[in-house]
A protein has these predicted regions:
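Sensor-1/coupling segment of RecA-like P-loop NTPase cores
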Residues: 5-28, 153
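Conserved P-loop NTPase "ATPase switch" module shared by AAA+ and STAND
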Residues: 1
């Protein structure tokens, strides 16, 4: 159907959808060379504040806890907001990744999620994570598998990798990088709305701005 529409002059076609329909790599594969990708991220704090207004400090505290998923603004109370974020994480994001990517070790995927969520902005890499899982959990998962799983989390727009620009040569592959949550509210929901270290949360929020 889309190919038929492409033949009509002076027509722009916008194809939208959540990650439950298409992950990032699916979009690139389906429409390679025939489209432009426009990524719509959760609200930054600036966008969030433009919607809620009021005292900026109070708005920031609210944003640092619940994040910038737009539907959060329509939830009536704290319990509803927390339940929404928990459900979104478990029923949409995790299920999509497991089903579409054929994840064989969901337990390892969720361990990686917990580790990244609890240490946003900290330096790490797949080898370090693999060693941590081996020492703490007795897991024999390879660094390559960890790298692939992290790639799936990025592909689902749960995390974004920040690399150093002063690393060259072979060390580029082994040097630790930082991973930031695409939405701090989803990060908080994953770890039960605890570990509210404001320095790391603020760093994550600034990165997303």
């Amino acid at each position: 159907a889309l190919n038929d529409l492409r033949g009509i002059s002076n027509l722009d076609v916008y194809v939208t959808g959540s990650n439950s329909k298409m992950l990032s790599s699916d979009i690139l594969t389906e429409f390679r060379g025939r489209s432009d990708e426009i990524r719509v991220h959760p609200l930054s704090f600036a966008e969030y504040y433009s919607a809620v207004g009021g005292d900026k400090n109070e708005a920031f505290d609210e944003y640092a806890f619940y994040g910038g998923m737009p539907l959060i603004l329509s939830r009536p109370d704290d319990i509803a907001k927390m339940n929404y974020l928990k459900s979104l994480f478990s029923e949409v994001y995790i299920k999509d990744i497991v089903e579409r990517k054929g994840i064989e070790r969901q337990d390892v995927l969720e361990q990686i999620l917990d580790l990244l969520c609890s240490s946003v902005g900290s330096l790490t890499n797949p080898t370090k994570i693999a060693n941590t899982l081996k020492s703490k959990q007795g897991s024999g998962v390879s660094a390559n598998t960890i790298r692939a799983y992290i790639g799936h989390l990025e592909d689902a727009f749960l995390f974004s990798e920040s690399k150093r620009y002063d690393v060259k040569g072979k060390s580029y592959f082994d040097y630790p990088n930082k991973y930031y949550s695409e939405d701090i509210g989803l990060r908080n929901a994953r770890i039960g709305f605890r570990q509210q270290e404001m320095t790391h949360i603020m760093e994550n929020i600034i990165y997303n701005e």
